[in-house]
Amino acid sequence: MDEIKPKKEENSKRRRNVKPICRETGDHVHYLPTCKTKPKPTRTHHAPPPILDSIFKVTHKPHYYECRKNHAADIGTTAYDGCGEFVSSTGEEDSLNCAACGCHRNFHREELIPENGGVTETVLEVLKISSCQFRRIFCSPYGGGKSEGKKKKKEKESYGGDPIIKDRFGGAEEEEGIVKRLKTKFTAEQTEKMRDYAEKLRWKVRPERQEEVEEFCVEIGVNRKNFRIWMNNHKDKIIIDE
């Protein structure tokens, strides 16, 4: 029995040391040493940029006025002692009792007043802010920085029948590449002639009649492109009216 026990212990040790064999290749399987993964660092969420109230800190000072203690509350009526303003009994700001009426400071009406004593003026303490926070708060979010006065202005003038008029005097709008497009106006005589000629063309300009249309436009003083635009805009309207 004593010899059997050491044999069993040797067999159990061998089984522990035996490495597993892969069924497909027949090789011993080597396990890689397990390593503990390091936890990912957590990102700290920064607070949003401060608003104007935090940039300009307004400091106030409490001031106590008339006493509102009801001395006749026990008998069901109202009676005040007539004290119009809290007076410190010790001459210090931290005093809690009024020297005039003897009541506690909480019975007096409290009002916050700026430290400089003014009504409209306030004491502003400018806090330190970074340049990035300054841009977020004070700079334009659209990145333009241009005033609204530089927008396109609508003009109601007609200039020789040309549909597009550019600023030829080196204005700001020409530098920015802005082209003013004006609405072309025609006289009653031009409108009547264009209508008669459009009916003659059956409201369509064919390629073989391009030169004829050009001569007609020069004769009445209208740009050929304007005439075609006018004809396309009024073709359906005139046909419906008829």
From Swiss-Prot:
Zinc finger (ZF-HD dimerization-type): 64-111
UniProt biased composition (Basic and acidic residues): 155-166
Main location: nucleus
DNA-binding region: 179-238
Subcellular localization, as worded in the UniProt entry: Nucleus
Site description Required for DNA-binding, residues in chain: M231
Disordered: region residues: 144-166
Gene Ontology MF terms in the entry: DNA binding; protein homodimerization activity; zinc ion binding
Alphabetical list of Pfam families matching this protein: ZF-HD_dimer (PF04770)
UniProt keyword list: DNA-binding, Homeobox, Metal-binding, Nucleus, Transcription, Transcription regulation, Zinc, Zinc-finger
Tissue specificity as recorded in UniProt: Mostly expressed in flowers.
SUPFAM superfamilies: Homeodomain-like
Any GO CC annotation of this UniProt entry: nucleus
Function noted in UniProt: Putative transcription factor.
Subunit relationships: Homo- and heterodimer with other ZFHD proteins. Interacts with MIF1, MIF2 and MIF3; these interactions prevent nuclear localization and DNA-binding to inhibit transcription regulation activity. Binds to ZHD11.
Free-text note on domains in this protein's UniProt record: The homeodomain differs form the typical one by having namely 4 instead of 3 extra amino acids inserted in the loop between helix 1 and helix 2.
Name of the protein in question: Zinc-finger homeodomain protein 13
